[in-house]
Design a protein with these regions (language model features):
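Sec-dependent signal peptide recognition
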Residues: 2-8
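C-terminal motif of bacterial Sec signal peptides marking the signal peptidase cleavage site
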Residues: 13-16
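Residue-level detector of conserved, well-ordered beta-strand and adjacent loop positions
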Residues: 18, 35, 52, 126
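Contiguous, well-ordered beta-strand patches that form the walls/edges
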Residues: 40-43, 58-122
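Broad, structure-driven detector of short, well-ordered beta-strand segments within folded domains
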Residues: 46-53
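Short, low-complexity, Pro/Ser/Thr/Gly-rich segments in the mature regions of secreted, periplasmic
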Residues: 122-133
């Protein structure tokens, strides 16, 4: 009889378990190299932004359109003079453009973090290391 109670209790316990795990939404970082294209085609990219430790560096293509090897070959010493401090918190990007100007935009990631959309700004950037189109 005692074994029956243990079995019933075990069954009741196992059946009453509910998987209520709330998985957090994926977190994507803004850190890294991102290319911008004036068209919807990433192959037309002529500008790259690199976000590193709160500083945004800007690079322009010399022989456009630049391919992945070209963009990957650039180092911070190749960036245009002047940098922009930035903060990325709660899906909001704030870039200090200096002289009292600031870019504040909501960021939405797609393609497993390989593409980002800016709310009302230059629209989209592609992460350099992604295969997103």
């Amino acid at each position: 009889m005692r074994n029956l109670y243990i079995i019933v209790l075990a069954i009741f316990t196992l059946v009453s378990c509910d998987d209520d795990t709330n998985l957090p939404a994926p977190y994507y970082s803004i850190e890294g190299k991102w290319i911008w294209s004036p068209s919807d085609n990433r192959a037309d990219a002529n500008t790259m932004y690199e976000f590193v430790d709160g500083i945004r560096y800007t690079y322009y293509c010399i022989t456009c359109p630049g391919d992945e090897a070209y963009w990957n070959s650039l180092e911070t010493s190749d960036a245009i003079p002047g940098t922009n401090p930035y903060k990325f918190e709660n899906d909001t990007l704030r870039v200090d453009l200096h002289f009292g100007n600031e870019l504040v935009t909501l960021i939405t990631f797609e393609c497993d973090g390989g593409k980002l959309f800016m709310d009302g700004q230059f629209s989209h950037l592609w992460r350099l290391s992604s295969d997103c189109q």
